[in-house]
A protein has these predicted regions:
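Interdomain motor-coupling "hinge/lid" segment immediately C-terminal to the ATP-binding subdomain
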Residues: 1-53
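Hydrophobic (often cysteine-bearing) scaffold residues that line and stabilize catalytic clefts
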Residues: 15, 35, 70, 123-128
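A short acidic, leucine-rich amphipathic alpha-helix
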Residues: 57-61
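Short amphipathic alpha-helical interaction segments
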Residues: 65-80
C-alpha cells in the first residue's frame, strides 16, 4: 500500500496521491458530479479539525452544501470508506447525543499532516487521533464527554462505562 511506501521513501506526494485516490474511488464517485468540490471542502475541513468537535450545520454553512442531510451522508460515506470516524458526546439521553456535535478522527495522521490545513504541529490533537485509532480496534463504543469537565474518550460495553481516557501531550496544573 501507499502508506508504507511513504515511510520508506519519505515523499509527501505519496500520501497526498493515496488520499486523493481514496477520496475519488470510495467517496466522490458515490455522489453526483456537482458535489465533487464541496466533498473536497468537507474532506479538508475534517482533516484540518481532527479531534475537534464538528457540527454538520456549520459545515453546510461553510460549503456549497446547503442540505445538512447531504453533509451527514458525506460523513457516513467517509466512515464507510474507513477514512474518517465520528464519535458522539456521551449523554444518558440518546436525543442529546444526536443533537450535540460529534468529534472527528482520521484513519492516518499522515493524511492530517500532509493534506490538512495547519499552521502548527498540534501534537496534542495528533496524539489524540492515534489513541482514537487504537481504541477503535477494541470494538467498544467510544464517546467524548464535555460538561463540568471534559474527557477525550468514554468507553462503554453494553450498559457499563468501562473507561474514561484523557489524552494530553504535556501534563501540567492547567490540564489535570
Amino acid at each position: 500500500g501507499g502508506i508504507p511506501k511513504f515511510v520508506v521513501d519519505g515523499d509527501s506526494r505519496i500520501l497526498s496521491e493515496l488520499y486523493e485516490n481514496i477520496l475519488y474511488r470510495d467517496v466522490i464517485k458515490r455522489f453526483k458530479p456537482h458535489l465533487e468540490k464541496p466533498i473536497k471542502e468537507v474532506s479538508l475541513y475534517f482533516l484540518s479539525t481532527v479531534a475537534k468537535r464538528c457540527s454538520f450545520r456549520n459545515i453546510s454553512v461553510a460549503t456549497e452544501i446547503k442540505n445538512i442531510a447531504t453533509v451527514k451522508s458525506i460523513a457516513d460515506t467517509f466512515e464507510k470508506a474507513f477514512l474518517f470516524f465520528f464519535i458522539p458526546k456521551f449523554d444518558f439521553s440518546l436525543q442529546k447525543q444526536l443533537q450535540n456535535p460529534r468529534k472527528g478522527y482520521c484513519v492516518d495522521n499522515g493524511f492530517v499532516t500532509q493534506v490538512g490545513f495547519r499552521f502548527s504541529e498540534d501534537r496534542g490533537r495528533l496524539l489524540e487521533n492515534v489513541v482514537f485509532i487504537e481504541l477503535k480496534r477494541t470494538k467498544k463504543e467510544i464517546y467524548y464527554f464535555s460538561g463540568k469537565g471534559e474527557c477525550d474518550f468514554v468507553l462503554r460495553v453494553g450498559s457499563k462505562i468501562t473507561d474514561a481516557i484523557q489524552v494530553t501531550w504535556e501534563l501540567n496544573e492547567n490540564n489535570r
